[in-house]
């Protein structure tokens, strides 16, 4: 409650009024000494005196009009403009004296005069329910009297009127004052809807703007230009009791009726009237008699029960006639009064809930029509008899209370259960759920009818997809049924909201400046924070750069030291190599340019496309790795509002229905997996135990991982999953053990066969020795390509043919079964191992055949025997390695990398031995590791040196050692006494030997062809021998041992190596026809795996050592048995990958001092001269008694197979030139 504003301002002229009431026409009761109360109405309603309160006959001249109230504490000076008192056209022109019959208590200089005790506080509701009547008293025709028509009292004496006072501003609502008085509020307190008005209960005098204490009567015209406009008080104007106007002079049409545009009032109407372009006002234009009546007010409880008008909606006006007497003809008016009062007591919110916004204009039109209808009632003759009893007021209050209760029940908001469920409950008793009372709703409902046609079969769907389909398939009516705030007419623009213009104006005039200051302060702090962070960052960056410079310098120094140490170490190694006389790879490449050519065999795994290489390099890039692994750091939150004012309400796991979640106890126990799904689950579980995500993926997404988990635990007791896993592992172990057992049994069977073959081979050798004693002594040596002894002896060609066919079938079968081939290889290796245990094999003629060890001791080491020895050792090592397998890994440790060069020095290119020494690397891993790092580390030199020391293998042959080549076979002289019928065919250019020991091979008839009919006939005896029919050509890639020396087959002829170049020369010289020689030579399959070509072109110097006798120990025995010198027998040894020497250089680059000669001492004939000779013979070169010094070859075609093929193609012309050079060198 605020105090009234000062009664006048500085510069205002002091108004004159009668303080002591000298005029007898004015009742003395009006000028009592009671002061203005300290209320929000600022004394606008005067309190009656004690006399007036008790004397009903005293009637004031005017009725007091209740005025609107304002909020306390508001200022008065700038709130509303005041019209000038000197403006004659102003209807609210002030006067210098009061023209009312009664005057308010107190004066404008003493407004705080004590009020009478009969004053009670009143609200707008109490004003509506209370009836205020006045008695018309004749007080004379003074200009100050209301009865007199004057400039101070423009109303006539015979009628009452309602004066319409428009607002000074065009958009301000008008107000109405009874009896033509320009009633205007004194301060902002009059506008507040929150402050109640005081209502006089007894005889009340009227107050208008022309009263002495009225502030607007003293207002100046310049105040109308004030910036803040007067707030509306139309809500209270409707509560004023007015009279109908019969004088048309000052009557104006209401503003709400004249203006056709309507805008809803906002909640802030009391602060800014300019926000509204239209106000709705109601005025019950009823005649107000001036007869004095007795007024009774309701009790305090009744007053409190009356609802309060809301400021947001127009009030409902009372259309009753409170001054009408209770007569039969006025009952209708009383009923309308009761209805009007009932409506008045409804609050604004209740009215808004009853009637939506679009209906408000209709309500106002109805109110206006009702007011006009009531005003037409003729009550002129009854004005003096109008009176009101307490019964009328009490009944009206009672009706209003009942209507308020009904409205409260009707508009009471019913809270949804969802809202109540969100309240947190902490009582354990309330949280406890009775499991026995749980019920499960049957969710087995069918799918709804699709709104759109479904193409194809999409059902059944998983749970989430099904729910999504249901939501999309809902009709619009069902979707919007629960949308409480959905508007009937959609709002297209934000400015269409009723609060838009109001909030915009408030922001511009009030809140905008405050917000601007606050936001600018926040931005300023944020900017300062950023600057400080930048300074900190720059300081840290400088510090980091300094540390990086220090570390860079340190790493550079360490790098320099490391490079220097490596350079010194490299120099020491180079110096050591020079001292030892080892050539470096670079020096050797300069000496032998042909050796620098790369191998034609390429590893395709080393070649990748550019995109893949870029991807690999990108993955290795540390910057890329860092970028991929780095976390995305969000920016700092510098805004304090975002940093501190943001709040988050976590409703995760909020239980809104405790029975709903508890019902899982009944639902989860049921398993709905089908048999097919269960079988898929079992298969997936056995593959991925307890990895339910992978199991769900294995099932094809039929079930989610969560459902798989539930299914596992539901069926855990019925299905023993652990036992299923154990059984599966047992089966896997049993299958692996069965495979190992079968492999072991196969190897045992092969060992038994090997034992039998050893006994048979011993018997075969004894038979051969016996047959040699019965043979003729003068038998020329022949080349025999024998085989290792195995199986039954073959004495006839039929048996040989049968054996060839059997072996051919075995070859075809073994090519399809690689495992069987490996087993046979192991068996063959065991045969070789057992056969090499005997150091000397004695024949009947006293000839001793030494094993490789004995040959080494005597200074003679046959090449093929030595290779056989190494191959047997390799096979044994492989067998041991397979029997005790170790874990193989492609990772090379530091120890293995350091040990590898030492193993290369020890074993050279024998990868299997190096693999066995390392233990964790296979033969392929060792070979690949050598190929990758040989050029960089200079290992090729080590391998060449080791191979040369071991068997003279050149470095170039290491690269081709991986190609499967048929190895050379040792020449064994054991067939001097074999009968001609039992001698097999020996080669392409060979006939049967018939001459003596020293007879040259040229004496043999050259017409004998290897495939001719006389190929197997003896020249002297002409004894017929059954011809050997050749089987169809086959393509075996592996040679197997044979028990007897059989006749050569196509395979033997194709793969037979020709060991001696001088033998080839003699054979070529014995050919009479060059065309015949070419045809025989073309019969060789050059396209094979270079077996014959290698022997033809790659005959090294060590091929000259083809005898099993040494010059120091067995020269005498050879003289006693001359027939044994020229018989050469070649044995087939196991097919191993031991590197062979390349003899292209020996063919094309003869070594000085290494001439060859026939056994009779004459040199070899040139190639052209040998063509004119007779039958070709094949004498054996004499065994060497001293080691041969080897010089590096001048030309080497071992790394260039195309050059080798070209050399073979030009053999007739090229060989003679090379052999002539060789002869000249001798």
From Swiss-Prot:
Highest taxon listed in the record's lineage: Eukaryota
Gene Ontology CC: chromatin; cytosol; histone deacetylase complex; nucleus; Rpd3L-Expanded complex; Set3 complex
Alphabetical list of Gene3D superfamilies matching this protein: Homeodomain-like
Composition bias, Basic residues: 11-27, 732-745
Entries under InterPro entries matching the protein: Homeodomain-like_sf, Myb_dom, N-CoR_corepressor, SANT/Myb, SANT_dom
Biased composition annotated in UniProt, kind: Polar residues: 31-64, 132-143, 150-170, 264-275
Subcellular location: Nucleus
Any one of the GO BP annotations: cellular response to starvation
Function (record text): Part of the Set3C complex, which is required to repress early/middle sporulation genes during meiosis.
Name the record gives this protein: Probable DNA-binding protein SNT1
């Amino acid at each position: 409650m605020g105090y009234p504003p000062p009664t006048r301002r500085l510069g205002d002229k002091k108004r004159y009024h009668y303080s002591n009431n000298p005029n007898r026409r004015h009742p003395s009761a009006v000028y009592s000494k009671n002061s203005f109360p300290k209320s929000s109405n600022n004394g606008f309603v005067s309190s009656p005196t004690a006399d007036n309160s008790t004397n009903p006959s005293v009637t004031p001249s005017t009725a007091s009009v209740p005025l609107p109230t304002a909020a306390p504490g508001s200022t008065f000076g700038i709130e509303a403009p005041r019209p000038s008192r000197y403006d004659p056209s102003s209807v609210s022109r002030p006067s210098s004296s009061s023209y009312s019959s009664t005057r308010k208590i107190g004066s404008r200089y003493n407004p705080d005069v004590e009020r009478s005790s009969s004053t009670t506080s009143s609200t707008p509701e109490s004003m509506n329910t209370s009836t205020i009547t006045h008695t018309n008293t004749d007080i004379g025709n003074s200009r100050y009297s209301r009865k007199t028509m004057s400039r101070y009292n423009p109303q006539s004496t015979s009628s009452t009127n309602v004066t319409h006072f428009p607002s000074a501003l065009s958009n301000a609502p008008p107000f109405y004052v009874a009896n033509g008085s320009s009633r205007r509020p004194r301060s902002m307190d009059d506008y507040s809807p929150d402050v109640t008005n005081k209502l006089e209960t007894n005889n009340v005098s009227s107050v208008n703007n022309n009263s002495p204490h009225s502030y607007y009567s003293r207002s100046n015209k310049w105040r109308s230009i004030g910036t803040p406009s007067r707030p509306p008080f139309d809500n209270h104007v409707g509560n004023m009791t007015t009279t109908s106007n019969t004088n048309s002079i000052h009557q104006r049409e209401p503003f709400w009726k004249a203006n056709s545009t309507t805008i809803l009032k906002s909640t802030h109407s009391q602060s800014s009237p300019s926000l509204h372009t239209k106000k709705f006002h109601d005025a019950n234009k009823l005649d107000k008699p001036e007869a004095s009546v007795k007024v009774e007010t309701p009790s305090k409880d009744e007053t409190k029960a009356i609802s309060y008008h809301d400021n947001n909606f127009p009030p409902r006006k009372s259309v009753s006639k409170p001054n009408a007497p209770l007569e039969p003809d006025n009952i209708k008016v009383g009923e309308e009064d009761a209805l009007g009062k009932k409506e008045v007591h409804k609050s604004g919110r209740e009215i808004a809930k009853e009637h939506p916004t679009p209906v408000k204009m209709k309500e106002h039109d109805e109110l206006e029509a009702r007011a006009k209808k009531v005003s037409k009632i003729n009550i002129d003759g009854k004005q003096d008899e109008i009176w009101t009893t307490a019964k009328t007021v009490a009944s009206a209050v009672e009706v209003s209370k009942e209507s308020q209760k009904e409205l409260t029940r009707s508009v009471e908001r019913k809270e949804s259960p969802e809202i109540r469920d969100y309240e947190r409950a902490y009582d354990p008793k309330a949280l406890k759920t009775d499991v026995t009372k749980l019920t499960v709703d049957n969710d087995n409902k069918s799918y709804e009818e699709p709104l759109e046609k479904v193409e194809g079969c999409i059902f059944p769907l998983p749970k989430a997809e099904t729910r999504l389909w249901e939501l999309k398939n809902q009709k619009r009516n069902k979707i919007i049924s629960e949308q409480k705030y959905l508007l009937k007419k959609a709002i297209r623009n934000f400015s269409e909201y009723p609060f838009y213009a109001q909030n915009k104006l408030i922001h511009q005039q009030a809140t905008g400046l405050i917000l601007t200051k606050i936001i600018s302060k926040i931005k300023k702090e944020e900017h300062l924070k950023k600057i400080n962070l930048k300074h900190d960052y720059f300081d840290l960056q400088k510090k980091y750069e300094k540390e990086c410079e220090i570390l860079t310098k340190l790493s550079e120094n360490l790098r320099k030291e490391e490079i220097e140490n490596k350079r010194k170490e490299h120099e020491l190694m180079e110096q050591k190599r020079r001292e030892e006389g080892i050539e470096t790879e670079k020096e050797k490449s300069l000496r032998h340019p042909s050796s620098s050519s790369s191998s034609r065999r390429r590893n395709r795994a080393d070649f990748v496309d550019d995109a893949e290489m870029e991807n690999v390099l990108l993955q290795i890039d540390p910057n890329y790795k860092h970028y991929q692994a780095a976390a995305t750091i969000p920016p700092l939150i510098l805004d304090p509002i975002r940093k501190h004012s943001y709040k988050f309400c976590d409703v995760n796991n909020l239980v809104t229905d405790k029975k709903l979640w508890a019902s899982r106890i009944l639902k989860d126990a049921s398993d709905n997996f089908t048999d097919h799904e269960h079988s898929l689950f079992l298969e997936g579980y056995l593959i991925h135990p307890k990895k339910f995500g992978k199991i769900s993926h294995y099932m094809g997404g039929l079930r989610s991982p969560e459902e798989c988990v539930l299914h596992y635990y539901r069926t855990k007791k019925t299905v023993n999953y652990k036992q299923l896993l154990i059984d599966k592992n047992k089966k896997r172990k049993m299958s692996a053990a069965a495979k190992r057992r079968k492999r072991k049994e196969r190897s045992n069977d092969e060992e038994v066969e090997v034992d039998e073959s050893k006994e048979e081979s011993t018997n075969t050798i004894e038979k051969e020795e016996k047959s040699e004693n019965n043979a003729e002594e003068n038998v020329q040596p022949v080349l025999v390509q024998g085989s290792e002894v195995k199986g039954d002896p073959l004495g006839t060609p039929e048996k040989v043919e049968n054996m060839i066919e059997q072996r051919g079938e075995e070859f075809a079968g073994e090519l399809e079964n690689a495992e069987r081939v490996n087993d046979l290889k192991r068996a063959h290796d065991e045969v070789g191992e057992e056969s090499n245990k005997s150091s000397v094999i004695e024949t009947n003629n006293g000839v001793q055949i030494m094993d490789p060890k004995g040959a080494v001791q005597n200074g003679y080491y046959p090449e093929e025997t030595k290779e056989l020895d190494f191959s047997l050792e390799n096979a044994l090592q492989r067998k041991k390695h397979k029997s005790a397998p170790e874990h193989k890994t492609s990772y090379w440790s530091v120890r293995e990398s350091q040990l590898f060069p030492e193993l290369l020095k020890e074993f050279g290119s024998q990868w299997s031995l190096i693999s066995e020494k390392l233990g964790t690397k296979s033969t392929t891993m060792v070979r690949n590791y050598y190929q990758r790092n040989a050029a960089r580390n200079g290992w090729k030199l080590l391998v060449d040196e080791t191979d040369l020391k071991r068997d003279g293998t050149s470095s170039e042959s290491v690269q081709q050692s991986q190609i499967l080549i048929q190895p050379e076979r040792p020449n064994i002289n054991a067939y001097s006494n074999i009968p001609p019928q039992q001698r097999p065919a020996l080669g392409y250019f060979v006939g049967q030997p018939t001459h003596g020991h020293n007879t040259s091979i040229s004496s043999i008839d050259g017409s004998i062809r290897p495939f001719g009919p006389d190929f197997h006939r003896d020249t002297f005896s002409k004894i017929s021998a059954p011809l050997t029919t050749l089987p169809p050509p086959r393509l075996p890639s592996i040679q197997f041992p044979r028990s007897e020396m059989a006749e050569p087959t196509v395979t033997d002829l194709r793969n037979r190596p020709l060991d001696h170049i001088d033998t080839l020369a003699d054979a070529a010289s014995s050919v009479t026809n060059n065309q015949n020689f070419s045809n025989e030579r073309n019969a060789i399959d050059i396209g094979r795996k270079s077996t014959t070509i290698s022997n033809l072109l790659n005959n090294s110097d060590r091929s000259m050592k083809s005898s099993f006798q040494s010059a120091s120990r067995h020269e005498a025995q050879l003289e006693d048995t001359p027939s044994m010198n020229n018989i050469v027998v070649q044995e087939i040894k196991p097919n191993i990958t031991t590197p062979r020497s390349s003899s292209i250089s020996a063919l094309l680059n003869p070594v000085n001092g290494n001439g060859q000669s026939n056994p009779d001492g004459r040199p070899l004939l040139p190639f052209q001269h040998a063509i004119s000779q007779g039958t070709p013979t094949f004498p054996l070169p004499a065994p060497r008694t001293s080691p041969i010094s080897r010089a590096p070859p001048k030309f080497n075609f071992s790394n260039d197979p195309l050059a080798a093929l070209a050399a073979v193609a030009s053999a007739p012309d090229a060989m003679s030139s090379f052999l002539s050079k060789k002869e000249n060198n001798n």
